[in-house]
UniProtKB/Swiss-Prot annotation:
The lineage of its organism: Bacteria, Pseudomonadati, Elusimicrobiota, Endomicrobiia, Endomicrobiales. The keyword Secreted does not apply. Homodimer. It catalyses: (2R)-2,3-dihydroxy-3-methylbutanoate = 3-methyl-2-oxobutanoate + H2O; (2R,3R)-2,3-dihydroxy-3-methylpentanoate = (S)-3-methyl-2-oxopentanoate + H2O. It comes from Endomicrobium trichonymphae. Mg(2+) binds at residues 78, 120-121, 439. This is Dihydroxy-acid dehydratase.
Amino acid sequence: MRSDQIKRGAVRAPNRCLLYSTGISPGDLDKPFIGIASSFTDLVPGHVAMRDLERYVERGIAAGGGVPFIFGAPAVCDGIAMGHSGMHYSLGSREIIADLVETVANAHMLDGLILLSNCDKVTPGMLMAAARLNIPAIVVTAGAMMTGMYDKKRRSMVRDTFEAVGQFQAGKITEKQLSELEMAACPGAGACQGMYTANTMACLTETMGMSMRGCATTLAVSAKKKRIAYESGIRVVALVKKDVKPRDILTLAAFKNAIVADMALGGSTNTVLHLPAIANEAGIELPLELFDEISKKTPQIACLEPAGDHYMEDLDNAGGIPAVLFAIQKNLAHSKTVSGFDIIEIANSAEILDEYVIRAKNPYKPEGGIAILRGNIAPRGCVVKQAAVSEKMKVFSGRARVFNSEDNAMKAILDNKIVPGDIVVIRYEGPAGGPGMREMLSPTSALHGMGLSDSVALLTDGRFSGGTRGPCIGHISPEAAADGAIVAINEGDTININIPERTLNVELTDDEIKARIGKVIKPEPKIKTGYMARYAKLVQSADTGAVLK
């Protein structure tokens, strides 16, 4: 066992002495040491219920014949960090999480890991660590939140409260209604209720085979989630004994399966950042072209919030990820899972329990939820969640309204300075320029709440929340901070969007773009000290997954 390096031989007497001081017994030295990387925090709704899950994981590890050791990992709530300077830190926290898990696991020579995760950057960060360390590991995602109820309708945090800000600003609802809604939309613990980034990543984690069957869609408050945590603890010890490692599971086939599921579910555009970053740690390249190639061949068979009216609880009741895999199995490749079953076996053994939620025979859309666009604005690509774009906005031309930060754009939107026919361009919000590639949920939600999502588009080198809907194009590469063509766009330029043709262009010649780029004076860095200042110097382009050099 790997842990023998800290517990065997006379020379390790000091190490054993310290281990005994934690309360373990001599007999425990013969057992695998299993770390539980817990991202519990009182700050994040998706993570507040993890104390219970920690106990069940511990019990499972002990029942399986291992010794559990809990250690902490940070978690950022993108919803709480949204719309202010705190959002600079969200994407960068992914790398911190990966580095911290690697540090603890290697410093203490752990034999295996349970990665207790849930929210947006935590799950990819922990998967990056698993692929990098390549020691037996299972991810336990803590589960989605139940829907809220207000005015006789089910509600969610992302679509209802963020868009309510725009509705209030437009005079469509009162301050009292806004207050009542914010109290009702989030009834308890769990990740935000729709197919936003956290739940998308949970679904893809299960599809890739890194979590147990049913884990992704089981609600945070359910007893079933506790049983999954317990079973995961037992199973990770078996993986250690059989020497089954993450890179045995995280193969190119597994990543392709994840992209297929992503497209079928209409998942978050943030997966186009996270899957390549995880694959990079496993020594696999996932180019943007692969996402688009798979999207064109994969119908969208589920439509959850924000694009539709279903929630994670509905997907779970319809059979969860196994039922989704059953519906798309002809597009899947054989791949191992932590459960010991091939992903095709899991798909074949499932059934669809609600054909209105999972529409295998009558897909919601003929193509997958995400499209990759290219053109003279984004020669290295950009991303749009086409599942959340109305048909009338899939081909659109408009006048550029240019802002060098999200804050300035948001002020213009709330001051009613954006009108139908405009295309809002927000730049210097990329991985390096942001820094941290802030999510633009506040401006997109405000536009929708003000009734402009069918007449105004938004482009950015930043990114979008999984809760974004409307013609919102992000991840424009190269970014403004890297002298990308987005800096050449001036106020009033005409921009043409054609999602079916996968193009995004400004009506300028190549020579005009080059000349304008040469005259640009870059703004001062927004953050000059601390982690994010270092991050800005090391982070690569969005089309690489925004990984560090």
